[in-house]
C-alpha cells in the first residue's frame, strides 16, 4: 500500500463505507474534511490501535500480528482401551489421549539492506570462527602425534638400554661362575672309589663277600671326577645368601643336580632309570619351614561384641579351646554366641594374646564428618523453657493462660501425662515451652525435659508448698546446670502463703533474691493472670544473660521430645530443632530410625515451610517410631541415613543378645538359691506415645519384690494388634492399653483365649490395678493373732482329763477348741490344743478377762503353777505389694 492512499481508496480496501471510516478516524482523534484526503501510514497504525482497543483486544505490533497469522494450534483426542492385570483377573480401562500441537508457517518478512548487510557480516564472522577452531584442532592433533612419536622413541631407547644391561649382567654372572669353577678345580681332589675292592661287612656276623670281576670302566669317568669337588661343596653352597636367582644361576643349578644324579646307582639316567629318592646326604638342602621357637603373640581387633567362633578364628585356635577358656573364667557360652568386648579382651589375654579396640563405626564417622561441615554464623535464638513442678500445682494452667488455650481440661484426670511442646509469640519475643508431667512415675520425662531446656520454671502452689516432685525437679535442674525461676502459683486463694513457700525452698538451697540469693521468684495466678507479665519479663532477662545463640542455616540437628504411631499418618516424632534449619524433603536419622521428611506440623496443626533453632515441630516420614530422647540429625542422602540406622540397630541387637544370653555361673547359683516360689506377672503394655510407654514400664517393674516379679514382655506405641494379643495369650500376660484400643482381630483372639485386657487413661489407675492383680497372685498369708492369756494358779488331777490347770484370764479372751501355747519363764515349752474349758464344773465356750476357769490341755500333763497359757487363732490375711 503506497503512501498516497486516500480515505476513499482505504474504505474500498477494507470493505467499509466511507462515512463509517470517517467516523472511526474521528473517534481515533483524526479530523478529515472529505474522502479524497490522503491517509499516511502512521495514521493507519493509529486507526488500527483504536479499533483493537474498541473491540477489547490488546494492541499488537505488525510483526506479532504477522507471526500470529502464520501460527495454528490443533487439539487431537484419541480414545483406546487398555487391559490391566490385577492379580488373577483382567480389567479393561478406557484411556483418552489428548495432544496439542502448534504449527508455524515458514517464511519471514523481507529484510532491509541494513539487515542484509548485518546478516552477511554475522555469517562471515561465524565462518571465520569455525575455520579458526578447525585450525586449532588440527594443530592439537599434530602436537599429540609428535608427542606420541617422541614417547615411542624414548621407550625404544630405554628398552635397548635395559637389554644391554641384562646382557652385561648375564656376562658378568657367567664370568663369576667360571671363576668359581676354576677355584673349585684348584682344590685337592678326593681319591676315586675303587669299585673292584671288596666292601667291608655291615655287621661283624656277616661273611666277607667274594671278590667280583672288574666291571668295564665307566664312560663318564672324567665327568664324575669333575663333579666330585662340586659334590663336596654341596649344591646349596654356591647359591648361599641369594634370595632370588637369575636365569643363568637357575640353569646351572638344574645342570648340577642332573650331573649329580646321572650314572649313580639308584639314580635316574637319561634312559629313564629309577632315581635315588633317599633323604640326607650331600643333596639334602635346608628345610623350607622351621617351627617357631617362641610363642606367637597376635593383636586381635575386637569390636563392641564378637562371636566366639570369630574370636577363635582371629586367635588361630579351635573354637572348643576358647569355650574352655571362657568356662574357666565362669562364662557359659556356645561357639555361636556373642560376648561383649570386655569378656573377649579378658579371654584373649588369658590365652596369651593382645586385644585392641576395633573401630566398627564407619557410618557413624561419616555422619560426624557430614555434620561437622555445618559451620555458619551463630545468631540469637529463642529460649527453651521447661515448666516443672508437683502434680496439680498448675503447670499446664499457667501455660494455657500464656497460650490462651485450654489444654488442662482435655487431659485425662486433669494431669499431664506426656511432654507438650509449644512455641509462643509473646510481647517479649518468641519463647518455646516444654510442659512436663508432675506425677512420680514420669521421672524420666522430667529428666529429659531438664536436659533439653535453657531455663526451668518451677511452679509451686502457694497453698501446698514444696512437695516430693518439687524437690526432684530442683535436683534435675541442678544436675543439668540450668538456671531456675520459681513461679509461686495460686496466690489468689485465701490460704495462700508465699512466705512459707520461700522458707521451704530455702531448706532446699534455693534462695530468693529477697533473701539475698540469685533465684528469681515471681508470685502469679494462672487463673486470673496476675503476675504473668512479670514471669515473662524474668524469663526474657534470664535469656539475655545466657546469650543463647545457634546456627540458623545448614543441616538441622536436635532431640526427639516425644513420638507416637498415628493410624492415618504413621510414625510421628515431635522434635526440638537445636541447630540448623529443618525443611520438608530432608533425610534424617533418629536413633535406629531414618526417613525423609514428608511433612512438618506445628502445635496448631499448620504446616510451616521450615523449623529453625528452638522450634518444636512434628515430623512425618520416618521408618518407625523413635525412642523419646534420641538425637536426630539431617544427612545428605538416604544411603548414609540407612547405613547409620542399620549399624545402630545391629549394635543394639548384639548388645541385647549379650545382655540376655547365657548367665554367669554365680548368677545361676544365686537364682537357684533364691526363693523358688517367686511369682511372675507378665504384662503387655501399649500406649499412645513413647514417653508414656517408658514411664509405665519403669513404674510397674519397680513394683517387683522378693515374692513377685513383674515382667514386661512387650511394650510399644500404637493400638493393640493381633500380634500383641497372640504374644499375651502365649505368655499368659495381662494386656494394658493406655489411651489406645484393640482392633477387631485382636479382640477375637483375646476373647477366645481369655486374655485379661484392661484400658486406662490415668497412670494412677494403672499402678493401682497392677497392684491388685499382683496381690491376687500372691494369695493369702496365714497370720497368728493372740486373743487371750491365762495364768496358772493351781493344778488339779482329774481321772478323765488328767492335769487340769486352775487359771485366771489376765488378758483378752480364752476360747474353747482354739490352739494354745504353754509358756514357762516366757519360753514356749508346748504347743497344742485346748481340750476342755470349764467354769464352776460347767463347760463354757469362752472365758473373758478377770475370770477364773479350769483349763485342760490335750495330751499334756506337765502343767505347773506360774505357767502361762496363751490362746491364739490363725487368720488369713491377703498379701499386698
UniProtKB/Swiss-Prot annotation:
Entry-linked InterPro entries: DNA-bd_dom_put_sf (IPR009061), EF-G-like_DII (IPR053905), EFTu-like_2 (IPR004161), IF2_assoc_dom_bac (IPR013575), IF2_II (IPR044145), IF2_N (IPR006847), P-loop_NTPase (IPR027417), Small_GTP-bd (IPR005225)
Binding site for GTP: 389-396, 435-439, 489-492
Span list, region G5: 525-527
GO CC field: cytosol
Location(s), subcellular: Cytoplasm
Region (G3): 435-438
Region named G2: 414-418
HAMAP family: IF_2_B (MF_00100_B)
Protein name per Swiss-Prot or TrEMBL: Translation initiation factor IF-2
Organism the protein comes from: Stenotrophomonas maltophilia (strain K279a)
Protein's gene: infB
